[in-house]
């Protein structure tokens, strides 16, 4: 059964609940900087909670924010919005946030991983909400400055005060997301669909599809540069068309030859066997097996990722890609 979602827009959401409240954004990276700036520009009192030795402290001060240690920011805040990487969140939460929480505060997240997989277990006397813009931080900020916004997801995990949903929607509006539209979801659905999408398509599947297409062309004797153009470079053009017009709009924009070849051969390459394989790995996410595996590597995540990236970094497609990007003026 397909779930029906509720979408909220700008004129349906009030920011009144944020009046006289302080939002402490924990972290000043990709999302932290964008969300903090947008909320501040929307009239919300925003402070930053950062490590004193961190490089982002001075940058946040330069950007005009009040910056405190994480502990002090939590003490001063009504809403503690945690925007640091998934694997470091539990330790930071246990040591620097949880001991200073008080009744009626709210914990905010932009990804449900640690709540859904019980790496963070909040006390019962706080609200727990999620506001998850569906774009990188840079675009979240750019679209806000253009007078628009990016779509977002909102969810409530724990509603101690009875106002958690209104709070999440108000924060989404302050970030600019209700200008585009905000979809109500759950921590479970956001977390699992995000991980499944990353692994099957956006990061895992896409890289392997492009890489294997490149390898086939090269193995058949075509120059690597031509292979790169056909398997990788032009993928952006197609994705831009899909992003702007959908599948049908993209197909109407390409040549009839490309259309016929793609529609007749594509389903035979990405066939039901591939779909079944996708379902198998989606179940690893749904069962918690993937999370358990990734969490077990938390202490050595950098080394693990470095090792996993080596074959990609050393692949011929990367060497050729650098050459093509220089030709295109994208790299020096």
Swiss-Prot record:
Residues 5-185 form the KARI N-terminal Rossmann domain. Its cofactor is Mg(2+). NADP(+) binds at residues 28-31, 51, 56, 86-89, 137. It catalyses: (2R)-2,3-dihydroxy-3-methylbutanoate + NADP(+) = (2S)-2-acetolactate + NADPH + H(+); (2R,3R)-2,3-dihydroxy-3-methylpentanoate + NADP(+) = (S)-2-ethyl-2-hydroxy-3-oxobutanoate + NADPH + H(+). Signal peptide: none annotated. PROSITE patterns: KARI_C (PS51851), KARI_N (PS51850). Pathway: Amino-acid biosynthesis; L-isoleucine biosynthesis; L-isoleucine from 2-oxobutanoate: step 2/4; Amino-acid biosynthesis; L-valine biosynthesis; L-valine from pyruvate: step 2/4. GO terms for biological process: isoleucine biosynthetic process; L-valine biosynthetic process. It comes from the Archaea. One of its GO terms (molecular function) is ketol-acid reductoisomerase activity. Mg(2+) 1 binds at residues 194, 198. Residues 186-331 form the KARI C-terminal knotted domain. Keywords: Amino-acid biosynthesis, Branched-chain amino acid biosynthesis, Magnesium, Metal-binding, NADP, Oxidoreductase. Its EC number is 1.1.1.86. Mg(2+) 2 binds at residues 194, 230, 234. It is an enzyme of class 1 (oxidoreductase). Substrate binds at residue 255. Involved in the biosynthesis of branched-chain amino acids (BCAA). Catalyzes an alkyl-migration followed by a ketol-acid reduction of (S)-2-acetolactate (S2AL) to yield (R)-2,3-dihydroxy-isovalerate. In the isomerase reaction, S2AL is rearranged via a Mg-dependent methyl migration to produce 3-hydroxy-3-methyl-2-ketobutyrate (HMKB). In the reductase reaction, this 2-ketoacid undergoes a metal-dependent reduction by NADPH to yield (R)-2,3-dihydroxy-isovalerate. Belongs to the ketol-acid reductoisomerase family. This is Ketol-acid reductoisomerase (NADP(+)). The lineage of its organism: Archaea, Methanobacteriati, Methanobacteriota, Thermococci, Thermococcales.
């Amino acid at each position: 059964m397909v779930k029906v979602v509720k979408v909220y827009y700008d004129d349906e959401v009030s920011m009144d609940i944020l009046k006289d409240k302080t939002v402490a954004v924990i972290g000043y990276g990709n999302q932290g900087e964008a969300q903090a700036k947008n909320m501040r520009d929307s009239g919300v009192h925003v402070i930053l909670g950062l490590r004193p030795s961190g490089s982002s402290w001075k940058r946040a001060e330069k950007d005009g924010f009040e910056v405190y240690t994480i502990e002090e920011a939590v003490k001063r805040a009504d809403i503690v919005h945690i925007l640091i990487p998934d694997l470091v969140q539990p330790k930071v939460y246990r040591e620097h946030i949880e001991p200073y929480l008080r009744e009626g505060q709210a914990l905010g997240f932009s990804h449900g991983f640690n709540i859904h997989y019980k790496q963070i277990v909040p006390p019962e006397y706080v609200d727990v909400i999620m506001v998850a813009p569906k774009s990188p931080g840079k675009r979240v900020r750019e679209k806000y400055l253009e007078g628009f916004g990016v779509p977002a997801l909102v969810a409530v995990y724990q509603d101690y005060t009875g106002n958690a949903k209104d709070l999440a929607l108000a924060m989404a509006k302050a970030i600019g997301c209700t200008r585009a539209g905000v979809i109500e979801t759950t921590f479970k659905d956001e977390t699992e669909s995000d991980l499944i999408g990353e692994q099957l398509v956006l990061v895992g599947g896409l890289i392997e599809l492009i890489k294997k297409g490149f390898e086939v062309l090269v193995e058949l004797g075509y120059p690597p540069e031509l292979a790169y153009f056909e398997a990788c470079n032009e993928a952006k053009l197609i994705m831009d068309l899909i992003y702007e017009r959908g599948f049908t709009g993209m197909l109407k924009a390409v040549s009839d030859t490309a259309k016929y070849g793609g529609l007749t051969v594509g389903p035979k390459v990405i066939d039901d066997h591939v779909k079944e394989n996708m379902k198998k790995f989606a179940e690893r996410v749904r069962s918690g097996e993937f999370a358990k595996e990734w969490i077990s590597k938390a202490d050595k995540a950098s080394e693990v990722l470095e090792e996993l990236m080596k074959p990609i970094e050393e692949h011929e497609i990367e060497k050729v890609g650098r050459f093509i990007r220089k030709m295109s003026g994208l790299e020096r």
